[in-house]
Regions:
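Short amphipathic alpha-helical interface segments
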Residues: 10-23
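A short alpha-helical element within helix-turn-helix/winged-helix DNA-binding domains
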Residues: 27-38
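Alpha-helical residues within the helix-turn-helix
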Residues: 35, 52-53
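Beta-hairpin "wing" of winged helix-turn-helix
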Residues: 55-69
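Conserved segment of winged-helix/HTH DNA-binding domains
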Residues: 73-98, 110-118
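C-terminal regulatory/oligomerization modules of transcriptional regulators
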Residues: 98-152
């Protein structure tokens, strides 16, 4: 899996909002998120708009405005953020794996792509914003992190 800058920025911005929710700091300006995370503000505004359209973030305009999480951090899976800014977790040439038609000679390839997507989902749907903000990953995910082979 290739994690794009857009996904990385979206998760990092959501983490800032999750921390702000813990502190009950109110709306956070896009400029502040961009400065803290070294994210270009114009690009960040587009990302935050996509997160808002997906119901992950809320926003308010004006001097007292900014962004905040629309849901508690423990209910926002990393997979939700990825889908909000990029669509399905895993595609092949932009198509969903179950829609591919390889024919009989390569049918197992389609099944492999479906298994890859399921594997990604098993991690990305299990890990929430609250998990990454607290640096406490779910046990099954932490086992993967602790396995030296995962780092190769």
């Amino acid at each position: 899996m290739r994690v794009t800058a857009k996904v990385d920025y979206a998760v990092r911005a959501a983490m800032v909002l999750a921390r702000a929710a813990e502190d009950d700091s109110g709306p956070i300006k896009g400029e502040r998120i961009g400065a803290e995370q070294h994210i270009p503000v114009k690009y960040l505004e587009n990302i935050l708009s996509e997160l808002r359209q997906s119901g992950i973030v809320r926003s308010q305009r004006g001097a007292e405005g900014g962004y905040w999480l629309a849901r508690p951090p423990e209910t926002v899976a990393i997979a939700d953020i990825i889908r909000a800014v990029e669509g399905p977790l895993a595609t092949v040439r932009g198509e969903r794996a179950e829609q591919l038609d390889y024919g009989e000679d390569a049918g197992a390839l389609q099944e492999m792509w479906i298994a890859v997507r399921a594997s990604l989902r098993s991690v990305l749907e299990r890990v929430t914003l609250a998990d990454v903000v607290s640096a406490r990953l779910p046990r099954q995910v932490q086992k993967l992190v602790d396995d030296p082979a995962s780092w190769e």
